[in-house]
Each structure stands twice: as structure tokens, then as C-alpha cells.
Amino acid sequence: MIKVGIIGATGYAGNELVRLLLGHKDAEIVWLGSRSYIDQNYSDVYRNMFKLVDAKCMDDNMEQLANEVDVIFTATPQGLCASLVNDEILSKTKIIDLSADFRLKDVNVYEQWYKLEHKAPQYIDEAVYGLCEINRDKVSKDTRIIANPGCYTTTSILTLYPMVKEGIINPDTIIIDAKSGTSGAGRGAKVANLFCEVNESMKAYGVGTHRHTPEIEEQLGYACGRDDLKLIFTPHLVPMNRGILVTAYANLAKDVTYEDVKAAYDKYYDKEYFVRVLPKDVCPETRWVEGSNFVDIGFKIEPRTNRLIMMGALDNLVKGAAGQAVQNMNLLFGLPENEGLQIAPMFP
């Protein structure tokens, strides 16, 4: 049985980790860390856990936690994991970090986009970027840190990766339009996220400055063998609880048919349990992935402008956060990737 500790257990992603791990036959949650709710019953914070979780929230003492668990999930704001981790902790346990602290390989890029001084740059090189469908061969029993990808980045990269890797699109022409439910902004109280502020409205935010941009550029840059890739990424907030829909546009680099594009997607995803490439002319919808670890992908060739339109949808709290983290844990401990994640999407 894998003993699990969660730091940041009372955030939305943390609660989703709890929900998923309760159904995992090989995992046991032994530590629910939360600075905001120390000594409070977890089920008082999240009533959906009443009679399911009989434990109190504890502090985020990573050094103590490392002595008690096999893996620590850090579902915390940027900067916290890097400020806590050290050699002694990593000699005792493994860390799956849901923040951005170890996703970017260039510490200067991290500090530029996140406006934070990185507290543990010595661990950046060894951290594995945990996009399982692309990087699973880099995860082994010796891996100490997994950088769980962001929600927008997971959707964007999985939607675009085969097209970039196979040279079907010109990567310099990529434009990504992304829309997310409000849970992506976290559980903290902010005026911008109040009901009256978001209901009956949509807005773009982080235009030209969103912090997931360099993460997408870095990973797609690896796909095309470049370190200078630049693209346009614009996220939008939509009035729903959860879900992300990405629509990406790029110029075609060569003449292709529907069958050519479909074959390229199938080359990478045909055997992937969690990636569903949809039938022709079927567009992804967030409602068909809600509550699940699935990613739905569709595409359309636009011959009038010689562009390819690529679409992807996932649940930002599951495949975009907690579900992918559990998938990474399964990889880390040699379990089937879909253990604890064989959950049908919720509808309605």
C-alpha cells in the first residue's frame, strides 16, 4: 500500500486528489495538510467527504511528512514546494508537485514569468515533466520529483503535439484560444471570482502574459527540436465550475488530407487510454469529460486559409491537475496508469 501525504489538501485540486485516491486500491491517505484549516475535520471543510474521510487537517511540515509517507503531493501555490524541499526529504520520499516550481527547465524563465525567486533551482534538472502520454519513459523508480503539468498546458500540448512532431503544421504560426471554468482560479476568495463578477460574462485575461505560455512553448519546442519557439496563447474565464476547451490554429506545413492528420494523431494516441481522438466532424465538449481523466481531441482542415484547426477538452481539476498527478504516481510505483482513474465522465 502506497502511503500518501497531500500538502494543500483543502484547495480544489487537493480535494480532487482526495476524491480520486479514496477509490485507489493501492493508496492510503495518511496526511491531509492545510495551513488554513489546521486541526479542523476535513469533512467539515468539504462536506462531500462526510463519512468518507475521518481525519483532521494538519500543518504542511514536509520534513515530518517525509518520514511517514512514500509520496507527497503538493497542491500549493507557486513557490511553496521549492521553499520546502531539500536533500533529506528527497532521500526519504518522492514528490509530485502540482505547482509550476519544477516545470520549466530555465530558472530565469520561471523567475521572469512567475515573478518569484526560485528557492531550489538545484532540483530543476532532475525533475521529470509529468505529461504521461509523452514523457512516461522518463519516469522510473529512481525519479524523485515529478513536475505535474498545468491544466491549460496539458490541453494545449496534447492537442498540438502530434501535429508539431510530425511537421504537419508550421509551429511559428500557432495561436491558442483557451477557455476555463472558474475552479481553475483556485479556491481563494477574490473579487474577480465572485458569482456576480463571472456569471453571465466571459473575459480574456493574462493576454500576452499568461504564465503557462513558456511551458507550452518549451514542450512543443522539444517536439520540433527548437528552443526558440514562440506562440500566442490567450486564456478566457467562462462561467462554469470546471472544464477547459482549447481551440488552436496553425498554418499547414504541407498538403494533407483528413486521413493524414488522423493517422498522425493515431500514431501517438491510438493506444492511450486517456486520450480520445473523436470521429470526423465531432468537436470536443467539456461536458463529455467532466469528472474524468480523459482528454477529447478533434480537428478540422480549413482549406480556404490553408490552416488546421485543432480542439481539445479536459477537466481542469482531473486530467489538468489531480488525475494526472495520480497517473504519475501510478507510473512512479509501477502500477497500471489507469488505476484509480477508470471513472466515466459525469453527465448531466
Curated annotation (Swiss-Prot):
GO terms for cellular component: cytoplasm. The keyword Amino-acid biosynthesis applies. Catalyzes the NADPH-dependent reduction of N-acetyl-5-glutamyl phosphate to yield N-acetyl-L-glutamate 5-semialdehyde. Its EC number is 1.2.1.38. The active site is at 151. It is found in: Cytoplasm. GO terms for molecular function: N-acetyl-gamma-glutamyl-phosphate reductase activity; NAD binding; NADP+ binding. Belongs to the NAGSA dehydrogenase family. Type 1 subfamily. Pathway: Amino-acid biosynthesis; L-arginine biosynthesis; N(2)-acetyl-L-ornithine from L-glutamate: step 3/4. Its main location: cytoplasm. It is an enzyme of class 1 (oxidoreductase). The keyword Amino-acid biosynthesis applies. It comes from Lachnospira eligens (strain ATCC 27750 / DSM 3376 / VPI C15-48 / C15-B4). One of its GO terms (biological process) is L-arginine biosynthetic process. Keywords: Amino-acid biosynthesis, Arginine biosynthesis, Cytoplasm, NADP, Oxidoreductase. It comes from the Bacteria. This is N-acetyl-gamma-glutamyl-phosphate reductase. It catalyses: N-acetyl-L-glutamate 5-semialdehyde + phosphate + NADP(+) = N-acetyl-L-glutamyl 5-phosphate + NADPH + H(+).
